[in-house]
């Protein structure tokens, strides 16, 4: 047993092995890693230009018509109104809306180049109006006035934020259809975000 | 030395335990981690209103039925100079024809001659109708038809100004309305086209 170490040296070896085991253990989430989900996303107001009109008031003249009238003042038979298109579109988009980001500590060996090989993402989004309906934003005072909303996930992009930090961004495209909206003003909804890392 | 060996074994087991604990934690963290949260989203829709209307409309009144009304027998005294006296036809004595417009105006109701759609703060709009200056007479030379008491209606209410539903921007949710107006034929003596009547509809978001 000549080769056996003294108790003091054995203790040092144990400590060294413990430290080594910690360093060699695969790390995926250090305490320095931070997930930030934005609580509020106020989108740019929908403009008249986006709808395809120049003014908030539009007069649309219909073709003249002739109708027979009786002397007793009964209802005149008028032709069915054929409404002209008065605007361009009801579909509005808000692209690259940042909903969350993940900061990774570079001390764990993360780099912009290897972050995806070390951190695989599965992100689920669900958008719910204030009225409780899925894929809707609802008006603040009228639950029946809604904007149909669809969310499309964009690829997560990462960049070096500082010497010790890599930031990965969770962005989405939001597509709205205002054809079921009745009122002007603010429409509210909540996006539920579930991020699973592997 | 046995003790020391045993002691070393114990320590080695401790090392393995620590290593195992560290690995297990890493697997738990690295295997599958799930985080969730919510983001409130706000979108803002502008005010907007579209008024659809007819720029011109022509009303063709039906031709009154020609009648020959027999006012009955009459006997008149006639002098040798040719002067006749006795009962004569007068306003009071004329028999009623099928069409009589004395002291009355014809109220014309035209449904579905305007429509509105769009967005407003309240979800409603105000629709008003007026007759502009000079627009209250339809003329054919000296023959005139007076136009007055113009109203808008939406099938539920009627008036010179009404508050009505603004159901959104889609055609399928447009609100349709009509016009009522009175026509006075008391100064009309010509057949044919009488032109010049005007009304103005104004739709506003409220």
Functional labels for PLM-detected ranges:
Chain B
Residues 14, 26, 149-151:
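Detector for intrinsically disordered, low-structure N-terminal pre-sequences
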Residues 26-142, 161-206:
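N-terminal small/polar-rich segments of proteins
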Residues 2-12:
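Bacterial N-terminal signal peptides that target proteins for export
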Residues 138-155:
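Short, surface-exposed beta-strand/strand-loop-strand elements in extracellular ectodomains
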Residues 21-23:
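N-terminal signal peptide c-region/cleavage motif recognized by signal peptidases
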